[in-house]
């Protein structure tokens, strides 16, 4: 899987963390989210990469549903694919309400952006 670097796919990325370079990214497109939400997202992404390794991306799919992607480099033999799937399921369970609200927020954001582009 390639990281979305530009275009529509990149605009759908909410946040991500990279264990290889120890960096966290938050998409400025979503800067109007409350600080508490931004902090929760950072915690989710950073803890995931600390426990599992690799690169973690939280993004909206084409239907506006929140999805997670986990990517590893070819030579990363410490990456835990089984743990990655278990952690992914745990995150969806633990943050179900937050993710539902984020999907609503994203739908509203798309609607506003669409209306702005018409005028």
Language-model-detected regions and their locations in the chain:
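Short, structured coil/loop segments at alpha-helix boundaries
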Residues: 33-37, 95, 99, 115
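Amphipathic protein-protein interaction modules
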Residues: 48-107
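Short linear, low-complexity motifs centered on an aromatic residue
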Residues: 112-119
């Amino acid at each position: 899987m390639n990281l979305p670097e530009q275009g529509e796919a990149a605009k759908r990325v909410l946040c991500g963390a990279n264990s290889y370079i120890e960096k966290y990214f938050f998409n400025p497109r979503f800067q109007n989210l409350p600080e508490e939400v931004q902090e929760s997202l950072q915690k989710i992404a950073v803890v995931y990469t600390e426990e599992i390794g690799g690169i973690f991306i939280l993004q909206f799919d084409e239907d506006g549903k929140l999805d997670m992607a986990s990517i590893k480099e070819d030579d990363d033999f410490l990456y835990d694919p089984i743990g990655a799937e278990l952690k992914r399921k745990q995150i969806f369970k633990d943050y179900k309400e937050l993710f539902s609200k984020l999907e609503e927020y994203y739908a509203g954001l798309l609607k506003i952006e669409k209306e702005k582009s018409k005028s």
